[in-house]
């Protein structure tokens, strides 16, 4: 991937906008369908490429069904055989503490409640075992997300992992990830996870700075984190990956560079770098508004953090797995995250879990009692299901390519029988090239550092640009869900674990 230079000196800070405010700004602009609303700022593409980020994750929207209608629709979908790659997501909706920046906190940790949940989760995994959608083809990656999956006791971990092995047709090389936090991730839990088949650990470190961690209500300090990570790596039995987040209040470039250096000094297999999203209703937004914390980093400063991480890991000879994911050993394959942005199916289990079958996105009930009550009636506890729009598969393929740092519209057009796809997009792509977001290399449109930083916005804008021109397109203006309606995007992000900023 191409590297543009980025500013080194301190730049003036502006109050960071919330995610929702940015999404509204982009939605209003794109709804006009004016070409300029899609164009990038050529004067400073890295720091000020667009007015705001379009969404947490790019993706075409759909028409939703709710409650019983969603459950009936999902029931019918489960008799269709799957094709292509498949994921499985398992949600564990309990946390010992609530981090200030998290919008996806569901339930406080109580040992008896977590143990009871594990047993109900096994019931749900077993419920549709043998149905075509669950068992007709291999599952290539399983992800335990949350919440805090490491809240499970060793016995609970063994129980649920045993059900996964028994009732899901795992591929021979299936990636099985357990997400969690360092705090209370004891040796007996690690060993139970390894015994149960976990071959990848994804731990939410976020920052090694004890001061920044304490301000975000994180529990363990720098030394404790490093000690536990080295202990986990010492088992040498699974990939160990950590998340780092940039943009926290009081997180200077010096703090961020120390985070990067510390991560690279450990025996890790991978590092994921995510930017902080400040949600309007999060405790963090409230603390900032009340003056209890300084502002989080604005878009321009976060761009410098991002560019520095790319520069640093490139110089350390780490390999790029996607715009946000880095690996240093062959163990880190990043399968779930890579396929999660694509059109592939994702089976989903657990309270608040989200998935996708045949292009239909769905989410389980987020209320624990509602989830339990519906499950006890012998039904899959779906709360929400969105049918795919026309051309959803093509659009998600664009989204997936953009996540990896480059898109080949000529190839995508051939695959989906839309020979003019690249020509449709060319006026927009040309402006982005001129603005410094993209470079053309053969048939590939490759993102610069600026393009990588804004890749989610680029993907969403490109899909919005193309959608009305595609065969069979619905004659409607883009809506808030096209750009990423905050409410729906937050619900689905919580369900599919793709906003790692909530990992503990």
List where the protein language model places each region:
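Charged, E/D/K/R/S-rich low-complexity terminal regions of large eukaryotic assembly subunits
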Residues: 354-504
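A broad, low-specificity signal marking well-ordered, structured residues that form hydrophobic/aromatic
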Residues: 88, 176, 347, 445, ...
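Flexible, acidic/Gly-rich N-terminal and inter-domain linker regions that tether
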Residues: 1-86, 135, 485-502
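C-terminal scaffold of the Radical SAM
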Residues: 85, 109-131, 137-418
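Canonical Radical SAM [4Fe-4S] cluster-binding loop centered on the CxxxCxxC motif
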Residues: 82-118
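Extended hydrophobic/aromatic-rich secondary-structure runs
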Residues: 38-53, 66, 71-79, 83-91, ...
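Beta-strand-connecting loop/turn residues
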Residues: 95, 269, 442-444
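Hydrophobic residues in beta-strands and at strand termini
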Residues: 92, 180, 446-448
């Amino acid at each position: 991937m191409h590297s543009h230079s980025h500013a080194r000196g301190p730049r003036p800070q502006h109050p960071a906008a919330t995610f929702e405010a940015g999404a509204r700004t982009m939605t209003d602009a794109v709804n006009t369908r004016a070409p300029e609303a899609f164009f990038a700022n050529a004067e400073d593409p890295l720091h000020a490429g667009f007015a705001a980020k379009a969404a947490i994750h790019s993706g075409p929207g759909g028409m939703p069904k709710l409650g019983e209608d969603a459950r009936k629709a999902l029931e019918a979908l489960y008799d269709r055989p799957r094709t292509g790659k498949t994921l499985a997501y398992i949600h564990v909706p309990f946390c010992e503490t609530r981090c200030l920046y998290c919008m996806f906190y569901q339930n406080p940790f109580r040992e008896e409640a977590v143990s009871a949940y594990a047993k109900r989760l096994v019931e749900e995994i077993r419920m549709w075992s043998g149905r075509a959608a669950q068992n007709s083809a291999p599952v290539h990656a399983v992800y335990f997300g949350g919440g805090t999956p490491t809240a499970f006791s060793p016995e609970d971990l063994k129980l649920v992992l045993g059900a996964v092995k028994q009732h899901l047709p795992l591929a021979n090389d299936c990636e099985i990830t357990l997400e969690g936090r360092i705090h209370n991730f004891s040796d007996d839990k690690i060993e139970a996870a390894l015994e149960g088949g976990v071959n990848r650990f994804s731990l939410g470190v976020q920052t090694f700075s004890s001061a920044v961690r304490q301000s975000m209500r994180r529990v363990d300090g720098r030394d404790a984190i490093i000690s536990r990570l080295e202990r986990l790596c010492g088992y040498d039995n699974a990939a160990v990956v950590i998340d780092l987040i940039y943009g926290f209040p009081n997180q200077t470039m010096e703090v961020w560079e120390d985070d990067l250096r510390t991560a690279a000094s450990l025996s890790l297999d991978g590092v994921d770098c995510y930017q902080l999203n400040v949600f309007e209703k999060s405790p963090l937004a409230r603390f900032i508004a009340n003056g209890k914390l300084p502002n989080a980093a604005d878009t321009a400063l976060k761009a410098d953090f991002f560019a520095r991480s790319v520069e640093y890991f490139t110089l350390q000879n780490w390999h790029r797995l996607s715009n946000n994911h880095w690996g240093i050993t062959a163990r880190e394959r990043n399968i779930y995250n890579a396929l999660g942005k694509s059109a592939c199916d994702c089976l989903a289990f657990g309270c608040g879990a989200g998935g996708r079958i045949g292009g239909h996105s769905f989410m389980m009930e987020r209320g624990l009692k509602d989830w339990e009550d519906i499950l006890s009636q012998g039904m899959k506890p779906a709360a929400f299901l969105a049918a795919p729009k026309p051309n959803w598969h093509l659009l998600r393929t664009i989204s997936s390519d953009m996540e990896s740092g480059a898109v080949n519209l000529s190839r995508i057009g051939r695959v989906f029988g839309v020979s003019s796809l690249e020509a449709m997009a060319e006026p927009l792509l040309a402006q982005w090239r001129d603005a410094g977001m993209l470079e053309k290399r053969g048939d590939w449109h490759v993102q610069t550092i600026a393009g990588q930083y804004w890749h989610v916005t680029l993907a969403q804008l490109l899909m919005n640009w193309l959608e009305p021109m595609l065969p069979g397109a619905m004659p409607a203006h883009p809506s808030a869900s096209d750009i990423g309606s905050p409410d729906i995007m937050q619900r689905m992000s919580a369900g599919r674990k793709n906003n790692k900023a909530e990992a503990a």
